[in-house]
A protein has these predicted regions:
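Long, low-complexity, intrinsically disordered segments
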Residues: 268-275
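Compact Cys/His-rich metal-coordination microdomains
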Residues: 2-3, 254-259, 271
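ABC family nucleotide-binding domain
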Residues: 17-226, 230
Length: 275
């Protein structure tokens, strides 16, 4: 665990464009003979202003890595920093504030409040925190995600793709340092999934955001700048400028010759029409 002497990130964490990093990150569940080592002394740097995908076979530790980097789960050993803030030693109240103010989240389930309309769902975390959104930034996010004509619609009046766009806007609304997306296209058809991936790509390219996405889909990973491959709780490989075919081939190496998922059209086309 962290010590009082290690409260700052490694030198130049922000200056060198690092949004988050971990050193010797270890996460174990259970004890004794039943111990399961989900993460095994992982070192990782998440580059600021880039789209990073995390992939691996089932049980490889990819979701656990995201949860530990985001402060959603405690670590068994090692250190994690968000920017220049070490989060492994923070109290729960401080972690809650950090997640609220500096991190955005997207999940496979949209987690929208059914009684609120789209814009109310988008601003809800900031409303709860007593913060006012930057209206210029919020307008830019809404227009980038194509939600201008859907702001008064409740979730039941929106398609799955539109609901995930609302969830994406909610993650972006506070202009966070880092967005974590856990299987964000898992509940969507291929067309809606393409749109959401396109919007995450735009969030990085046009809005200057940093995105870390956990996915099992090689096509989804192909929208990223960098893919990190996990196996048995360790980062075992990485791929710059990935394609779906290259990711699929790499995944076969970690899955005993059987790929986790087929390559999908998400890597071959970009979203065009609105839902």
């Amino acid at each position: 665990m962290s010590t009082p002497a290690a409260q700052h990130a490694p030198e130049h964490a922000e200056a060198d464009g690092t949004a988050a990093r971990a050193r010797a990150l270890t996460k174990a569940y259970g004890s004794g003979e039943t111990t399961v080592l989900a993460l095994d002394s992982v070192d990782v740097d998440i580059a600021r202003g880039r789209f990073t995908a995390v992939m691996g076979p089932s049980g490889s530790g990819k979701s656990t890595l995201m949860h530990c980097l985001a402060g959603l789960d405690t670590v068994s050993a090692g250190q994690v920093w968000l920017g220049d803030t070490e989060i492994t030693g923070l109290k729960e109240r401080d972690l809650t504030r950090l997640r609220r103010d500096r991190i955005g989240f997207m999940f496979q389930s949209f987690n929208l409040i059914p009684t609120l309309n789209a814009v109310e769902n988008i601003t809800l975390p900031m409303d709860i925190a007593g913060q006012k959104p930057d209206q210029k930034w919020l307008d830019q996010v809404i227009d980038t995600l194509g939600l201008r004509d859907r702001l008064k619609h409740r979730p039941a009046q929106l398609s799955g793709g539109q609901q995930q766009r609302v969830a994406c806007a909610r993650a972006l609304a506070s202009r966070p340092e880092l967005i974590f997306a856990d299987e964000p296209t898992g509940n969507l058809d291929s067309r809606a999934g393409l749109e959401v991936l396109g919007f995450l790509r735009e969030a990085v390219d046009d809005l200057g955001q940093t995105v870390v996405m956990v996915t099992h889909d090689p096509g989804a990973a192909a929208h990223s700048d960098l893919v990190l491959f996990l196996a048995d709780g360790r980062i075992v490989d990485r791929m710059e400028r990935p394609t779906a075919e290259a990711v699929l081939e790499r995944m076969r190496l970690f899955s005993g010759g059987q790929s986790q998922a087929p390559a999908t059209e998400t890597s071959l086309t970009k979203p065009t029409d609105e839902d």
